[in-house]
Amino acid sequence: MKEVRIEAGWKKVLQEEFDKFYFEKLTDFVREEYRQSPIYPPARFIFRAFDTCPFDRVKVVILGQDPYHEPGQAEGLAFSVPTGIPIPPSLRNICEEIRTDTGQPAHIDGGSLLPWVEQGVLLLNATLTVRASQAGSHQGHGWETFTDAAIEALAKRREHLVFLLWGSYARRKSAMIDPRCHLILEAPHPSPLSAHRGFFGCKHFSRTNAYLRQHGIAPIVW
């Protein structure tokens, strides 16, 4: 993974993980996968969620499960796609909830969520790579251990963060977060399969900003 870099603050926090045997095995697995098959995102974007949202600047964490696995979609940020790529259904539903919740259209660049990242929104997938057209193909190889360590580091070393946990997989991560120190907001996944079961109407975006303001933190322009 020579192309990969990670922001200095995250590197300091996660150095113990880099030094563990599971991460060495994970690195070997991912390197071999990139050698043999089309893998997403491009290798230079594996740690992009961390690189674009420094540890000390995180205000909000949105958890995804897997990168997009079709050509041109994955850019290393959960739910985000590059500008010019058609907006996937889950992201379309996120934008719809923002519009009804805040009364404003989503402040994004096409389907790219970089405008959020630049304000301190960490868009973290639990698994950071995937084989083309094979959803979940890189689960169970160590990425989840690594990203759990990142979530735990934020939960223990920072305060007054907002964790947006959408869907049953993300909601299980609440066990790592102290609700006395952070705001945890849970809802069904924004996928068309589940958005009507409680994602629509959850008002997570206005509730996030109310909490941030309450603690003297600049709100997110969603």
UniProtKB/Swiss-Prot annotation:
Molecular function, one GO term: uracil DNA N-glycosylase activity
According to its UniProt record, which residues of this chain constitute the active site? Answer: D66 (proton acceptor)
Query: Which top-level enzyme class is recorded in the Swiss-Prot or TrEMBL entry?
Result: hydrolase
Its UniProt entry gives the catalysed reaction(s) as: Hydrolyzes single-stranded DNA or mismatched double-stranded DNA and polynucleotides, releasing free uracil
Q: Where in the cell is it found?
A: Cytoplasm
Q: What is its main location?
A: cytoplasm
Coiled-coil annotated spans? none
Does this entry carry the keyword Zinc-finger? Answer: no
Report the family membership.
Belongs to the uracil-DNA glycosylase (UDG) superfamily. UNG family.
Q: How is this protein named in the record?
A: Uracil-DNA glycosylase
Which gene produces this protein? Answer: ung
